[in-house]
UniProtKB/Swiss-Prot annotation:
InterPro entries with a match to the protein in the record: PPIase_dom_sf, Trigger_fact/SurA_dom_sf
Signal peptide: 1-27
Protein family (similarity comment): Belongs to the chlamydial CPn_1058/CT_355/TC_0634 family.
Keyword Nucleus attached: no
SS bond partners: none
Protein name: Protein CPn_1058/CP_0792/CPj1058/CpB1100
MF terms (GO), sorted A to Z: peptidyl-prolyl cis-trans isomerase activity
Key words of the record: Signal
Keyword Signal: yes
């Protein structure tokens, strides 16, 4: 999967509000303690322009790798520029985007760090050439806007993309092998039978409602009986011939458009009338007196829903089941990594609810 597709997959937010400072420069090194959540609120640097800079430790993966607020900011920078390059000069747009996306991106960055650590243990790496190609595909060869507006160095950009690609690679390897074992031909056939059963419960009704009018109710009833007899005998709908018949008897024919509806779309009154018709032996049931004349329900077709043959549907079903299983396996893999490295979701929830706003606050 291309990285830019992953970036596009994150929900985009409309622009607005006040710009919150985003500075790419690293501060002096923050001492790492044994706890992944200590030093959570230490501020290391301040932008001369008056915007707060927060290179705080958010999570400690191991002795060599920690997730800082700056890692999240760098990811937000690239996501924003990839989605809205034309708004790179808009402080309000960046403010709205960063504030709204911070919770989502924080968790994704932590998961990426965990997967990169797992990839390292499994000796899985991404070719630097592939990383550079991805950067060029996403942003072109001119990266000066990223340097100028986000103060990100080439190495900063490389690290974000390398981490994302490596996480995608190890995730793909872990997920695909397990999912392929679960999406078996038997599972595909079972899902196809389920679709067949669902389709068979859908009945499609195609019908018209005819109204016969005349000077008297008695005459309208007689003409309606003749129209019903003609339709049930001919088994075809010929509006011109029926109109001529009604006019010759001193009446007027009004016909509705042709309806094509499923059971769930039918009104109760129409459903009751259509059920009384002995289709396909007859097209019309008995005429019903109405204030506007006599009504006839003419059933042109009644079919059960169906789906394409298995050999046509197999590929689509396989893709659908693969996606469902992949989502489940991916969650299980992430949960195992979080448990292994001591990820505490409650601490992250606290960070998001209580401490995230100061990370992007104005002085």
């Amino acid at each position: 999967m291309k990285l830019y597709q992953t970036l596009r997959g994150i929900v985009l937010v409309s622009t607005g509000c006040i710009f919150l400072g985003m500075h790419g420069g690293y501060a002096a090194e923050v001492p790492v303690t044994s706890s992944g959540y200590e030093n959570l609120l230490e501020s290391k640097e301040q932008d001369p322009s008056g915007l707060a800079i927060h290179d705080r430790i958010l999570f400690k993966v191991d002795e060599e790798n920690v997730v800082t607020a700056l890692d999240v900011i760098h990811k937000l920078n690239l996501l924003f520029y990839n989605s809205y390059p034309h708004l790179i000069d808009s402080f309000p747009a960046r403010s709205q985007y960063y504030t709204a996306m911070w919770p989502v991106v924080l968790e994704s960055v932590i998961d990426e760090f965990l997967m990169v650590a797992d990839a390292k243990a499994k000796r899985i790496a991404t070719d630097p050439t592939a990383v550079n190609q991805e950067i060029e595909e996403m942003f072109g060869r001119d990266l000066s806007p990223l340097y100028a507006h986000f103060e990100m160095s080439p190495n900063d950009i490389f690290n974000v993309i390398d981490r994302t690609l490596t996480a995608q690679r190890v995730m793909g390897m872990m997920v695909r092998s397990k999912v392929m074992l679960k999406v078996t031909p038997g599972k595909i056939r079972e899902y196809y039978r389920k679709l067949e059963e669902e389709a068979s419960r859908k009945v499609i009704w195609k019908y018209r409602v005819l109204t016969i009018k005349a000077n008297t109710e008695s005459l309208a009833s007689q003409i309606a009986d003749k129209v019903r007899a003609r339709l049930n005998e001919a088994k075809t709908w010929d509006k011109d011939r029926l109109t001529a018949l009604v006019i010759s008897q001193g009446g007027q024919l009004v016909c509705s458009e042709e309806f094509s509806r499923e059971n769930s779309e039918l009104s109760q009154s129409h459903k009751q009338e259509l059920d009384l018709i002995g289709y396909p032996k007859e097209l019309c049931g008995l005429p019903k007196a109405h204030k506007s004349g006599y009504k006839l329900y003419m059933l042109l077709d009644k079919t059960s829903g169906s789906i394409e043959p298995l050999d046509v549907m197999e590929s689509k079903i396989k893709q659908h089941l693969f996606a469902l299983e992949a989502e489940s396996v991916e969650k299980q893999y992430k949960d195992r990594l979080r448990k292994r490295y001591g990820y505490d979701a409650s601490m992250i929830a606290k960070l998001l609810s209580e401490e995230a706003p100061p990370l992007f606050s104005l002085l």
